[in-house]
Amino acid sequence: MNRTVSGAYAEVEAARNSARPTGIDYISNVFSSFIELHGDRRGGDDPSLVGGLAYLERQPVTVLAIEKGHTAKQRQPRSFGSVHPEGYRKALRLMRQAQKFHRPVICLVDTAGAGCGLADEQHGIGQAIAENLTELAGLSVPVISILISEGGSGGALALALTDEVWMLKGAYYSVISPEGCAQILWKDPARTSEAAACLHLTADDALKLKVADRIIPETDLGKKPFYDNLRGSLASELERLGKDPELTEKRYARFRRFGDFAADDGAF
C-alpha cells in the first residue's frame, strides 16, 4: 500500500485514541475558576457540549468544549462527542452572552460529527448548526477554535467559524469520515485509507490550504508544559485580536475565500 495513503488514515486512527486529552482536560489545565453553565433555555441540555465561564490568565473568557470522555462509561452519556441540537443551542446562548459582556470565546473541538439520530433531526440539528455559524460570523469579540483531536464535518464547523483555527499536530479536520467517503464513492470499505489521503484532512494539509492558521506541536501532550505553552499562546493571540477594529470583517473575508479557486494566494 502507498505510504502516503496509509499515513493519513493512521493519523485519523491516532486522533481517535481515547487516551488523548479531552475538552474537560483542557478546561481543567489551561483555564482557571471555570463555572459550567447548563441548558439551552429552550427545554434541553446536552452533556456532550460543556460550556461556561473561566479565566485565561487574568482575562475572563467563555469556553465551549465538545467532550467525549475517555472510557466507555464516560462516553455513553456524552454521545461519544456527537453533539445534539440542545448542545449547539447551549453554545449559541453562551456566545450571545459573551457578546453582551465583551468576553472572548475559546472553542475546543473534538467530534466525529454532529448527532444524526431521528431525535436530532426532529429537534432541528441542521438549524442549530446554521444558527451557530450565523452567530459566530457576527461576533465582535475575539473567537479562537482549537481542534484537539477529531474535527468531523458540520459538527466541528459549528464551533469553528472563528478568527483563528488552530489544530493539534495529531488532529484531523474533514467534511466526512474516511469510512463514509469510501462507502459513498466506491462502496468499498477496503479503500478507507485511500479516502483519507484524498480528503487532505491532516493538520499539515489544513495549514497548507489555509483552513487552519496554526499547528500546535504535541510535545509533552497532556502534561503541564504543554498546557502552559498553550495558555500563553492563547493569551497572546487574544490580546492581538482584541486590538483589531476590523475583526468581524476579516473573519468574514477569511471564510468567503474558501472554495475560491481563482484566489492568487495559493490556498485553493
List PLM regions with ranges.
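Terminal-region recognition feature
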Residues: 1-183, 197-268
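Catalytic-center loop of serine/cysteine hydrolases
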Residues: 178, 188-189
